Amino acid sequence: MSAVIKHSEERLMKVLLAPVISEKATFVAEKNEQVVFLVMPDATKLEIKAAVELLFKVQVESVQVANRQGKQKRSGRFNGRRNHTRRAFVCLKPGQEINFTEEAK
């Protein structure tokens, strides 16, 4: 049951907000061959997969998403909250690689 779903290129360009470059993301990338992205809160797994394949010209094996709640913070006597974020853990097929540390050409 392989349904081909067409997404507009305009929407796919907006789905990925930024790559996550952190110690944990680097560990996951090395161990599980995954790449971590911040994505739009309403992005689906199929949209994330299509966006990564379109922008980086790689083949995606699977996508896992995690919704992170914003932390409660206090500034003086005022309470606030950081924004909620949605992260996508994109597993690439063997032999595929996205490297953000190289210099752009």
Curated annotation (Swiss-Prot):
InterPro entries to which the protein is assigned, alphabetical: Nucleotide-bd_a/b_plait_sf, Ribosomal_uL23-like, Ribosomal_uL23/eL15/eS24_sf
GO cellular component, one term: ribosome
Any coiled-coil regions, as ranges: none
UniProt-listed Pfam families: Ribosomal_L23
Gene Ontology terms: biological process: translation
Any one GO molecular-function label of the UniProt entry: rRNA binding
Keywords: Ribonucleoprotein, Ribosomal protein, RNA-binding, rRNA-binding
Function per UniProt: One of the early assembly proteins it binds 23S rRNA. One of the proteins that surrounds the polypeptide exit tunnel on the outside of the ribosome. Forms the main docking site for trigger factor binding to the ribosome.
Family: Belongs to the universal ribosomal protein uL23 family.
Subunit note: Part of the 50S ribosomal subunit. Contacts protein L29, and trigger factor when it is bound to the ribosome.
Protein name: Large ribosomal subunit protein uL23
